[in-house]
Amino acid sequence: VPWLGKVILGTTDSPRQDVVREPLPFKEEVAFILNESARYLSRAPKQEDIRSIWVGLRPLVKPQDEDGGNTKSISREHTVLASRSGLVTVTGGKWTTYRAMAEDVLQKCFDTGVLPPKAAGITNQLPLVGSPVGAVQHSISDAPGIHLYGAEAAAVASLPGSAKELGGGLTEAMVRFAARFEYARTVEDVLARRSRLLFLDARKAIDMAPAVAGILQEELGIDPQLPAFLALAQQYLRPEM
């Protein structure tokens, strides 16, 4: 899948018994993905082509009439359940359908009386932050990556360091914007959540981390947790096979 100038290869379907915050990949999974990709790409990918590798655990809702042994047959759709106590639970699903999941949760709350019924929601017409209403043209310089901010581009360009590239598509101003307006508080917030550099190129994220930490320290005056990020990012480097 093409993504932000890179290519994501995956996925695997390996049941796991351990539940940890940052699961590590199985070497067999990495080998499987490389071997399968070689069947479809003009040049077979190799270990040294890997820039970052990560694992996520997907919650699947097991049907009551199945033993759950074959995870491939279990639906990837989300499920909303309401208990007798009034607890409403959403499980399964994926981040890309978060709005639909939220709507279904609220509808379940209305249907079960947990919340008083309200008129139809506005989610379908609600623009995301930064989405301009109509065409908007800003008199700003061609700062790197500034187009990604939509209607907030002018605000990013007005901050110190808008032309100072740190690498990985980030400028100093983007880090400042993340700290001031996007509630970024740590290096991980910036390099893994406000941007996706950790997932695109772990080594580059490691190299940039001290500069990002310095900007956050200047902006916020708090510990940006640089050592914690460096330890985390090491796990995203390709494993030795």
Identify the role of each PLM range:
Residues W3-K6, T12-M241:
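C-terminal accessory subdomains/tails of enzymes that are appended
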